[in-house]
Curated annotation (Swiss-Prot):
One of its GO terms (molecular function) is guanosine-3',5'-bis(diphosphate) 3'-diphosphatase activity. Accelerates the degradation of transcripts by removing pyrophosphate from the 5'-end of triphosphorylated RNA, leading to a more labile monophosphorylated state that can stimulate subsequent ribonuclease cleavage. A motif (Nudix box) lies at residues 47-68. This is RNA pyrophosphohydrolase. Gene3D superfamilies: Nucleoside Triphosphate Pyrophosphohydrolase. Keywords: Hydrolase. It comes from Azorhizobium caulinodans (strain ATCC 43989 / DSM 5975 / JCM 20966 / LMG 6465 / NBRC 14845 / NCIMB 13405 / ORS 571). Its EC number is 3.6.1.-. The gene is rppH. Transmembrane segments: none annotated.
Length: 168
């Protein structure tokens, strides 16, 4: 049996999407084995990097697949890859037990469109499965309080790295 610490991390992207007021997009997860309770079901968009795909290309694809958003400009990115481990009980269920957690390349983007562009219930015109049941704009510093606890350290680092975009 493979030990959890011997498994690789799943390569992913994370996105801090800022509106003009400097708040970030948070989506409330529909479901998943990682849920603890409703107060920790909010997160920023994220997703896997396909084989041969560049991280920024994956970021734009994932953003569209989860929110229908295309109207963005890049503000910056975290230089390092940020990783988190899944709790043991979740690691066996998520991704068929192939990964110990995720390693993420984080990007900051400014949303330049109209909120009517955002569609989390039928993202991509219904071409993609909904991952969120609700969304809102909130303060970047609050995101770590609202995310599932095992992702909190990553969100705190993202907040430090991208704080300058929250007050433009």
């Amino acid at each position: 049996m493979t030990r959890l610490e011997d498994l690789p991390y799943r390569p992913c992207v994370g996105l801090a999407i800022f509106n003009r007021a400097g708040q970030v997009f948070l989506g409330q997860r529909l479901s998943g084995p990682e849920h603890v309770d409703a107060t920790h079901s909010w997160q920023m968009p994220q997703g896997g990097i396909d084989k041969g795909e560049e991280p920024y290309e994956a970021a734009l694809r994932e953003l569209y697949e989860e929110t229908s958003i295309r109207s963005v400009v890049k503000l910056g990115e975290v230089e390092d890859w940020l990783s988190y481990d899944l709790p043991g009980r979740v690691a066996g269920e998520a991704w068929k037990g192939k990964y110990r957690g995720q390693t993420q390349k984080w990007f900051a983007l400014r949303f330049t469109g109209d909120e009517g562009e955002i569609d989390i219930l039928k993202p991509g015109g219904g071409a993609h499965k909904a991952e969120f049941c609700n969304w809102r704009w909130d303060a970047l510093d609050r995101a770590a309080e609202l995310v599932i606890p095992f992702k909190r350290q990553v969100y705190e680092r993202v907040a430090r790295e991208f704080r300058r975009f929250a007050h433009d």
